[in-house]
Structures are given as structure tokens and as C-alpha cells.
Amino acid sequence: MNWALHVSASLPFFTAPSQADAGILAPQVQAVGRAAARALCDELALAPKPGLVSFADTGSHDDMDAHTFMRSIFALRPYYERITVLGMARAPFAALERCGIEAERHMLAATGGINTHRGAIFMLGLLCAAAGVLIGQGQPLDASALRQALLTQWGDALSTRADRTPTLPGGMASARLGLRSAGREAALGLPTLFETALPAWQQAERSGLA
């Protein structure tokens, strides 16, 4: 069975692409998975990063190092391809959430129970799913289209999720300090990424700094 069709057929709650479509689109899905894994490697390589793990040191952590992160990245690469396929099929958010929970299990198995990439499973996974929507529609993967696909396809579900009482440390800290949580960022279409970080990166590139 074709690779992309096999992956999508193994996941519930959505219609798999046809075999012909899956055969055409599989290289694009794999390219998204490679880009996601490369982004995680680049983040790990970035130094200095006060408090955070890099190849230079472990920051403020005594339970993880760069090797822990690399094991996690290798374990998560298939997840980013799987969630891209879910995006191609415009799967409901519940299917994305199930896929992310399974990815978290793989991460914890690879790291011995250490949370290295829970945030990246959520945020980067959503971006891959949005990329899948655009791939399925034959659209280019530019930033504005990526953000719009995320909001159009899963914005309502993300808003509902963001309204839940937080149970994870990051969400509870955000609520206590009056900050915008990761879930709320996602529900708003990742404004910090698209309105602040990306323009800063593009300006740095134009200035020859990146």
C-alpha cells in the first residue's frame, strides 16, 4: 500500500486520500516532516540559550542533555508526517489531539520519561497539520496561508480548548501571571510567531544577520 495512504488509513476519524493523490503528495508530506525535525535540531543547536539545553551545555536542567533531545527528535519525526496527513484530510481536532497524545508517548519512551518536546508536539504539530491542509488543496506553503488554514480548520476547536481550566505547569503559570498561554496563542493563530518572530527573522535575513 502507498506510504501516505497507509499512514492515513491507520488513523480514525477522517477520510484517507485516494491512492493516486497519496502517491503524488507523499514526497511533500515527507518534506514537511524533515523540515519539522530540522527545526528541532536547529533549536537544539542554538546557543547560548539561558536555562535551555544546547550542544554547549544543559542550561538549568540536570535530567536531560543534547543526547536526550536527539533521541526525542528521532522518535517524533514520524509524528510530524502523520499529523500532516491528518491535515491533508482536514481531520477534526480530536484526531489531531489523539495523534499528539500518541506522539507524547513515543517521546517519553525515547527519553526515559523526560519531557523534552511537549510544546513542540503541540505547536509544531499544528503548523504541520496546517501545511497538510494547503498541500491537499494544492496551495503554496506561505506564512499567511498557513496561518489562515490553521484558523479556518481548527480555530473554533482551539478556542474551546484554550478556555479549559489549565492542568499543565505552563498553562497554570500563564494563568497565575496573566500571560497568554500556548493554547490561547494557537487559538489566535500564533500571533507571536507570525506577527513578531517571523518579521524579525525576515528583517535579519535582509540585513545579512541570519
Each PLM stretch: what is its role?
Residues 78-133:
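Long, hydrophobic/aromatic-enriched structural stretches that serve as scaffold segments
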Residues 2-89, 93, 131-210:
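Phosphate-rich cofactor/ligand-interacting catalytic cores and adjacent structured alpha/beta frameworks
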